[in-house]
Amino acid sequence: LWTRDYAGVYEAIRGFDWSQDAK
């Protein structure tokens, strides 16, 4: 469960970072 949650959080952070980079 922890690994799954971590994966989701990592993906969310990665998406956020990508959004900032695109900006």
UniProtKB/Swiss-Prot annotation:
**Gene Ontology BP annotations:** red, far-red light phototransduction
Alphabetically ordered keywords of this record: Cytoplasm, Developmental protein, Nucleus, Phytochrome signaling pathway, Signalosome
Query: What is the protein's quaternary organization?
Result: Component of the CSN complex, probably composed of CSN1, CSN2, CSN3, CSN4, CSN5 (CSN5A or CSN5B), CSN6 (CSN6A or CSN6B), CSN7 and CSN8.
Q: What does this protein do?
A: Component of the COP9 signalosome complex (CSN), a complex involved in various cellular and developmental processes such as photomorphogenesis and auxin and jasmonate responses. The CSN complex is an essential regulator of the ubiquitin (Ubl) conjugation pathway by mediating the deneddylation of the cullin subunits of SCF-type E3 ligase complexes, leading to decrease the Ubl ligase activity of SCF. It is involved in repression of photomorphogenesis in darkness by regulating the activity of COP1-containing Ubl ligase complexes.
Entry similarity comment: Belongs to the CSN8 family.
- The name this protein carries in UniProt is COP9 signalosome complex subunit 8
Where, subcellularly, is it found? Cytoplasm; Nucleus
Gene Ontology cellular-component annotations: COP9 signalosome; cytoplasm
Coarse class of the primary localization is cytoplasm
